[in-house]
Amino acid sequence: MSHNTFGHLFRVTTWGESHGPALGCVVDGCPPGVPLTEADIQPWLDRRRPGQGKFVTQRQEPDAVRILSGVFQDERTTAKFGGQVTTGTPISLIIENTDQRSRDYSEIATSFRPGHADYPYFAKYGVRDYRGGGRSSARETAARVAAGAIARKLLPGVTIRGAVVQIGPHAVDPGRIDFSVTGDNPFWAPDPEIVPVWERHLEQVRKAGSSTGAVVAVEATGVPAGWGAPLYGKLDAELAAALMSINAAKGVEIGAGFAAAALSGEENADEMRMGNEGPLFLSNKAGGVLGGISTGQPVTARVAFKPTSSILTPRRSLDEAGREIELRTKGRHDPCVGIRAVPVVEAMVACVLADALLRHRAQTGGGAHVLGENPKS
């Protein structure tokens, strides 16, 4: 199996399966001299950790991370940097799996669960780890969150915040989105008034043994103008690819996204004026990216997640012999996978932006052209 790595200069390779002994990642391209310990990574993993509410999977995993390589500490690093730092070599991270229940999946060893990757994995490789979905499980995203924690260390001036803005048919009013309150409820909701609505909806879904979809919004503020490159290194294209790679993601919008198709040119074009500290945009339909290059506006995106395919309702399917069967999925599953996707979405944005920063420095030296400056003679 190839294609387990993403990024160009800041490269992340994830490894491991849902019911294997461990999973993790290797981060290559992180510059040397960046202070880094497990304590810098663990809080981000704790935000994603399963078993923290009745509307998410009850699998109990501590998600304790260990750094195996790529860091060093002695008297000189302590004196210069204050402790352990990156060395510029590959950083290997490991997270042990401790709460596997593989017996829940014994009945589907030769059957294909509708909506899952079981059949395409079998069609491509001829062999698959059916326990919890193996490599295709959302358990893999723990490694992405760990990598994202390292990426954030390269982005001290950038703030990345995500929120669930829709569960099932119930969406947050865009005018009421407040990212600062997402930590006050179990749904990452940016509007407290939507919480009881989602609770009632999810309770109905859970009791029915079914599932529901969600939309996650993310914004990155503090991204300077100039990151990204035309034509095939567009920042929005890199973001879209990274976000679409997340398990259960079925759609990505940058800025106004598909809504832009219904706008006029006057409505969609973000007008500009000159402010005291540089250009000011009067709107942000572009989502902070024009021509594939950041504008200095907040970079914004939305990701649509499908309903969890593991449901208790019997469904028609096939087995490996081609026989028609009726299948009822067992195991511990999220009735709405989008709820726990917020830290994953944030992490993927962080990795893309860290990569964009390093590529920008490599191409231009990191400088930016400032409006109003006279060219050197």
Curated annotation (Swiss-Prot):
One Gene Ontology term from the biological process aspect of the record: amino acid biosynthetic process
Pathway given in the UniProt record: Metabolic intermediate biosynthesis; chorismate biosynthesis; chorismate from D-erythrose 4-phosphate and phosphoenolpyruvate: step 7/7
Binding site for NADP(+): R48
Highest taxon, organism lineage: Bacteria
Known EC number: 4.2.3.5
Primary enzyme class: lyase
One MF term in the entry's GO annotations: FMN binding
One term under GO cellular component: cytosol
Catalyzed reaction equations: 5-O-(1-carboxyvinyl)-3-phosphoshikimate = chorismate + phosphate
Keywords, ordered alphabetically: Amino-acid biosynthesis, Aromatic amino acid biosynthesis, FAD, Flavoprotein, FMN, Lyase, NADP
Entries under InterPro entries matching the protein: Chorismate_synth, Chorismate_synth_AroC_sf, Chorismate_synthase_CS
Function recorded in the entry: This reaction introduces a second double bond into the aromatic ring system.
Complex and partners: Homotetramer.
Family, as annotated: Belongs to the chorismate synthase family.
Protein name as catalogued: Chorismate synthase
Species, as recorded: Phenylobacterium zucineum (strain HLK1)
